[in-house]
Amino acid sequence: MHSSLIKLGFLLLLLQVSLSHAQLSPSFYDKTCPQVFDIVTNTIVNALRSDPRIAASILRLHFHDCFVNGCDASILLDNTTSFRTEKDAFGNANSARGFDVIDKMKAAIEKACPRTVSCADMLAIAAKESIVLAGGPSWMVPNGRRDSLRGFMDLANDNLPGPSSTLKQLKDRFKNVGLDRSSDLVALSGGHTFGKSQCQFIMDRLYNFGETGLPDPTLDKSYLATLRKQCPRNGNQSVLVDFDLRTPTLFDNKYYVNLKENKGLIQSDQELFSSPDAADTLPLVRAYADGQGTFFDAFVKAIIRMSSLSPLTGKQGEIRLNCRVVNSKSKIMDVVDDALEFASFM
């Protein structure tokens, strides 16, 4: 009975998404590129062999893409003379990663289905497959997005939640992009159930919280001692620390168990449980900690909503041939490559 209700709820959610964004559909590539899902999965599986972090990194790319002008693959663009890349924004600089895997994925898709699958759709599919490979839930990704023609670094600086954000700031950032439900914020924050963060993002919590010269009082004392060993006061701040001390490579509900024990890694995570303003988020943390299925159901609903934010569809934008550059640049680079190849035979 419970399973049937979940399926019914999922179908109703897809109907809601399709009514809001009629051009997005889980069957969008059924006839034009049905192999896209296998290509994406195989690329991630191969990458995981040498990089256990890559699944979490790809999910983060999708999150940070959708929070800036909708899910349009703008985060994948490199710098040009006309705009600064989102890769240079505070929330991405020296931390966003996985672009080489995205390049391999796109090259394989272009070989199989030329000029068919957008980078934005590919990234949304890759985020889902990354979660599934890490033990998380599966869902049908609504597709049909197209790619932006530019990046938005300033908007990324304004929209992306930061590691030291208060609960009020988090709610404001989510509301600004169209995610105004507490369940969206708490469920999507569960993406931190795997992956790593750098010491630089928690140093204030460990040593000088709120300019007090003291650690964050919400931090569990034993966890504080552990983190201080990993991130000494004058140590290398690029050292990586697991978000989830229990199951760092699995997509599960242990993130919320950690929050209940005051063992959230970054301030913005612990705020969901420990903030004085957490009257609406604290019960959700408890519910997700007590039931992994409850968390999975909420996460799927929230990520479908997020991935359907303000998509470019129809003839808007383009389908990039190379996710790093808009197509006019891709064509120029192809001409240059062809010329260099020709010259090598002269």
From Swiss-Prot:
InterPro entries, per database record: Haem_peroxidase (IPR002016), Haem_peroxidase_sf (IPR010255), Peroxidase_pln (IPR000823), Peroxidases_AS (IPR019794), Peroxidases_heam-ligand_BS (IPR019793), Secretory_peroxidase (IPR033905)
Enzyme class: oxidoreductase
Originating species: Arabidopsis thaliana
SUPFAM superfamilies in UniProt: Heme-dependent peroxidases (SSF48113)
Disulfide feature: C33-C113, C66-C71, C119-C323, C199-C231
Binding site for substrate: P161
Residues glycosylated per entry: N79, N236
Protein's name in the database: Peroxidase 38
Gene field: PER38
Entry-annotated residues carrying Pyrrolidone carboxylic acid: Q23
